[in-house]
Amino acid sequence: MFDLKEKLRTLPEKPGVYMMRNDKNEIIYVGKAISLKNRVRQYFQSSKNHPPKVKAMVSHIVTFEYIVTDTELEALILECNLIKENRPKYNVLLRDDKTYPYIKITTNEEYPRILKTRKVIKDKAKYFGPYTNIGALNETLDVIHTIYPIRTCNKNIERMIANKERPCLNYHIKKCIGPCTGLVTKEEYHQMIHDIILFLDGKEDELVRKIEEKMKAAAISMDFENAARYRDQIIALNNIVEKQKIVSVAEQDQDVIAMAKNEGNTWIQVFFIRKGKLVQREHFILKDTEDDSNQEIIASFLKQFYSGATFVPKEILIEESVEDLNVLEEWLSGKRGNKVSIKVPQKGDKKELLDMVKKNALMTMEQATTVIQLEKEKTEDTLIELAQLLDLEEVPYRIESYDISNIQGVESVGSMVVFEGGKSKNKDYRRFKIKTVKGPNDYASLEEIITRRFKRGLEETQDIIEQSLEVSEGKFAIFPDLIMVDGGFGQVTSVKKALHSLNLNIPVCGMIKDDRHRTKGLVYEGEELSIEKTSHLFRLITKIQDEVHRFAITYHRSLRKKTTLQSILEEIPGVGEARRKALMIHFGSIDKIKNATVEELLEVQGMNRKVAENIVEYLNK
């Protein structure tokens, strides 16, 4: 039994990190403290001065844990890692890192590639980002590939050269320099990668000077073809440099951070200044921050943003000072490798620069808020139209859609997607493996997954009532206002049969397609309803139908791929269950295993040379 008084009494007066847990043993808050004893006790003293958010959090605390650290810096690093890993409900959170893309240069490969990724891992590759503007990221990648035709494939270049394999189409249309031909040296290829890194580091001026020297040397030696290529590269780079605004005469690297608050959310604007030029800007949204002070918001942003950032500048400008500023500077200096200063300018050029970022933060917030409001009004009108079409008593705020996917009855799966207020709610999506139905029977499969979903929901609802829990704490406890199934009258009948067996009365309609497998309309209460194809309602139905189909197909493919991989690897001598699992964990896909060299395979846990050679020989027959 958890004894709160005893645990509070024995808290150490040392720096560390504390984790608050609820009755499900979930971490709902992570914090750091100079003195764990003083900080943690504050939560359980008189709540008069606590803001509503803290009061709500404390009401859910069932137990807490703490980790003692030697220094405040260690506590800060641990806090950042725990917040990133657990994403606690009551911490100020940036959107999940996985949703922000990065540019990745695979410098861990002999012939590196440049990729777009949403995951930063310790694999000796070089990362740039995060980017919140996908359009700007894609434009950057287009420019890079235009100037530097590096490879985009994941083929084994050394093997292609050794076997004299034919290069792909990209080589013939001059979109790839073709390292697989053996006509390009590693030094030449790596020089291109070095130039790309200079470009992404914001050192375009230095890069242009280097290319100008190459152009002059090529012209002197009468290599006019390469001289022309270098000239085109310089023109492309100068076009980018001209777009960059000079904001500081001092050629230094700075990040300038300002914020704007509205309707419980905080909009953060970051200007990235490199060598005195504004090279990029990004904005971020922190939700549900109405009870958090500006200092708390800024501190949380700095910790989370720079935990995932691939570059830390020498100077960071912010609007208000934050608690533990010195510790933050020490942490960032460690990440950068030399001194980093966090400053709050009060006057002069730096204050003017911060004011400019503040204006942009306000403008971005106002524009986005207007768009969100217009979108909300349009969606509300669309849902009202749907309610009128189906003669529903209530506007269907929450819609659940279901689909079955199988190929000749093999690996049948069901999927459930959720839309709330006309927008997909990905965290409520669910997948079901069909357990009781043999062979291709969509009707029986639908009946099974609907029964399982709502039976589980009823059980959770009972637990919530008995234990006085919040409805949101159940995975299936929230029921829809409308069910939309991918299919016609037969599918609708199966769903209604399952609901009837559980004494549930939820409206059900089917989304039907035409002969070309495109959205056609709805079926409801035995009647087929046509919808104007140019209407917002038609677009919403199409969106829901496409999404539930995509989700089902994706799940089905992943299961098939695992089965295929398993069967292929099972046939290779020396590859048992443990090695199959180790290969999958290390490489992630059959394609990557197929393209791996013997040396790369030897990096897999439990692998020996003979088995590695068997794998290469078998997969490349």
Curated annotation (Swiss-Prot):
Residues 205-240 form the UVR domain. Residues 13-92 form the GIY-YIG domain. GO terms for molecular function: DNA binding; excinuclease ABC activity. Pfam families: GIY-YIG (PF01541), HHH_2 (PF12826), UVR (PF02151), UvrC_RNaseH (PF22920), UvrC_RNaseH_dom (PF08459). The keyword DNA damage applies. One of its GO terms (biological process) is SOS response. It comes from the Bacteria. GO terms for cellular component: cytoplasm; excinuclease repair complex. PANTHER family: UVRABC SYSTEM PROTEIN C, UVRC/OXIDOREDUCTASE. Belongs to the UvrC family. The UvrABC repair system catalyzes the recognition and processing of DNA lesions. UvrC both incises the 5' and 3' sides of the lesion. The N-terminal half is responsible for the 3' incision and the C-terminal half is responsible for the 5' incision. This is UvrABC system protein C. It comes from Alkaliphilus oremlandii (strain OhILAs). The lineage of its organism: Bacteria, Bacillati, Bacillota, Clostridia, Peptostreptococcales.
